[in-house]
Amino acid sequence: YSFFLPLAGIITYGRWKYKWILGFSTILSLVFVCINIFKPEIHNKTLMPALQSPWFTPHVIVYMFAYAMLGAATVMAVYLLWFKKKGIERHEMALCDNLTYVGLAFMTLGMLSGAVWAKAAWGHYWAWDPKETWAAATWFSYLAYIHFRLGRPAAHRKALVGLLVSFLLLQMCWYGINYLPSAQGVSVHCLLYTSDAADEAR
């Protein structure tokens, strides 16, 4: 995530010339670098055999890029809701839209690659694992935002609230399921369970 945040910022700046995204992505990347330095144990996870696959790297990379873009869209949404009391400009909403388009596209690629990986590992493309369920809810939420923007382009604040709700769903999809009791021992995506299972196997 520390690598893909500034990369997302550079790509966004190169495409739409939003200068602020460079500073935002760099600062947020430094936050994650500090986490990696001072809490290295969070990465000390042993993957179960099914997850030790060539699909692991591209699947995670695509998702991290998607999360970086959608995170940037969320920061912009928060800024517009809290600091733009006199009206939101069309080009400001266009920024949120463009970031969401790219983020959702990469999220879709992540879901598709995950489905292919699941088929190879477990024999099915989709099993409504808790992680998959939250991923589907997140995907549909961002899709609903896009359709809402197309249908009601002037309803800026309602759209931005929807963007914040979508990001909350994304947080549950990303790491929130690790703490859901219903996911423990059930979800192959639950890192806490995966790590414990690997320890028991050793």
Model-derived regions, located:
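Single conserved hydrophobic/aromatic residue that forms the stacking wall/gate
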Residues: 193-202
